[in-house]
Structures are given as C-alpha cells and as structure tokens.
A protein has these predicted regions:
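C-terminal helix-and-tail extensions that cap enzymatic domains
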Residues: 1-149
Length: 149
C-alpha cells in the first residue's frame, strides 16, 4: 500500500493556484489566501501528516462532532469560532476581518504572504514556508515533467 505524504502537491495550493490569486489581486480585485494547518486535538495522533484537504469545513460550520466520534477541546472550539467568524464576515461584507480576530490581509503579490490557521490554534499572516518547494513543483509541471512525489 502506497502512502502519499505530500498532500500539498495534490490539492494545493499549487503554483497555478497562486498564479490565479496573483492575477486576481493584480487586476485590482481583492483575494484572501489561506492555509488551514490545524488538526483537531483528539485526532492529532491519527493525522500526523497534518490537516487534510477540506479540513477547515467542520470548523467553518461548527460541526466538529459530526462523524468524528471525539469531543472537541476548548482549543478546537476556539479555532472553530475563529474560522466561522472569518467566513461570516467575508460572506457579509467581502472582508474576513472583524473585532478580536488576527488581521487577515488581502493577498498582495508583492508581499506574497499567506494567512495560516496554525497547528497550535493561532492564526496569522507570514511568509509561506512551503513556497520554494511549491515553486519547484510548478516549474517541473510547466516543463512537462512529473513532479517527484
């Protein structure tokens, strides 16, 4: 059985995904880029590779107990409230920011920051630690070469 340990290469954000954000932001539109790296406390031992693709959905909708069979910790609930607040703010006024939330800046291709819901339950914008690896993946893909999985 092959275990795939590079989910960022499958689900992004891939280089082409970043290009889309760059194009969107460069044309005067506002885009908010994020990575969700938080894993529910009780599931961390099982999910050592990190948060799965779509892992933020249960946090955004506050459904942490649905089908998981675990009780959310206070930290899990706090991350869920934070994610929910960002999404509601964005849906309401086009800006995820609000009172009591860490600032989520719009994507700026010149600064190239990513907002991350971090493994420790905090959140904030900073340089993307995966950028160099994703740039290599993008270059190999554009050149018609298979990325090294």
């Amino acid at each position: 059985m092959k275990i795939f340990r590079r989910p960022d290469l499958l689900f992004g954000p891939s280089g082409s995904c970043f290009d889309g954000f760059h194009a969107f932001a460069t044309n005067g539109s506002t885009a908010y880029l994020y990575r969700f790296s938080y894993v529910q406390s009780a599931l961390r031992e099982k999910m050592r590779a990190g948060a799965p693709h779509g892992g933020e959905i249960a946090y955004v909708f506050g459904t942490l107990t649905a089908g998981r069979g675990v009780t959310p910790s206070a930290e899990d609930t706090a991350v869920s409230r934070m994610a929910h607040s960002y999404w509601v703010n964005f849906a309401t006024n086009g800006d995820p920011n609000g009172p009591g939330l860490p600032n989520w800046p719009p994507h700026d291709p010149k600064k190239d920051l990513i907002f991350e819901f971090k493994p420790d339950g905090s959140a904030g914008a900073g340089p993307d630690p995966r950028k160099a690896r994703l740039d290599v993946t993008q270059l190999n893909t554009e050149a018609g070469k298979r990325s090294d999985f």
